[in-house]
Regions:
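Bacterial N-terminal signal peptides that target proteins for export
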Residues: 1-10
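Hydrophobic core
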Residues: 11, 15-19
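Sec-dependent signal peptide cleavage junction
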Residues: 18-29
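N-terminal catalytic scaffold of extracellular/periplasmic and nuclease hydrolases
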Residues: 28-190
Length: 190
């Protein structure tokens, strides 16, 4: 029940972020978002974002104090932003697999597990799968690391993040529309 509420909240937040009307548009006209983006900065949190903003303000050298400068990262200008508690079932310091599961499904799981329950028997439906199935959205993954790595493997349902070959097989069967990234790891299954 709690997981369903979290999934619904994540979906609502994603849709709200993209549905904010453009300037001049009537506020009472509902708009369906054309695109929904979910950015995951692996290991990133508010201190990293704020430090990057301070750094960029410092190198701009506009004479303003970096702590009071009005200049902001583009991602800090979004009208709606959210965060999630991505600790997992077993650890306060989780890994990429369980945090990706928390973000994509609203469920907690064991470290090292991608989109499956703690017994590693039941697959969780991801927000990307729901958006595609229920609303007809296209889905894609863009990554700077291999596409069968735990974080970009949003499409997979595996008991172990180290099942690179099986994760790659799920990529093919995922029905996602676009993939781009750092290749695949262990493509032969050996």
């Amino acid at each position: 029940m709690k997981a369903k509420k979290i999934s619904a909240l994540l979906l609502a937040a994603a849709m709200t972020a993209c549905a904010v009307p453009a300037q001049g548009a009537a506020a009472d006209e509902p708009k369906v978002p054309k695109y929904i983006f979910l950015f995951i900065g692996d290991g990133m949190s508010y201190p990293q974002v704020q430090t990057t903003n301070y750094y960029l303000n410092a190198i701009e050298d506009d004479g303003d104090d970096i702590l009071t400068s009005e200049s902001k990262l583009n991602m800090m200008k979004f009208p709606v932003a959210g965060s999630a508690q991505t600790y997992d079932s077993t650890s306060f310091c989780p890994d990429s697999a369980s945090t990706a599961t928390s973000i994509s499904t609203g469920h907690k799981t064991y470290s090292g597990t991608i989109n499956m329950d703690e017994k590693m028997e039941t697959s969780y439906e991801t927000i990307a799968e729901k958006l595609k199935k229920q609303l007809g959205y296209k889905g894609g993954i863009l990554s700077s690391v291999n596409l069968n790595h735990a974080t970009p493997a949003f499409y997979a349902h595996q008991a172990s993040r180290n099942n690179y070959y099986e994760i790659g097989q799920e990529l093919i069967a995922s029905n996602f529309d676009y993939f781009a990234g750092g290749g695949l790891k262990k493509t032969t299954g050996s």
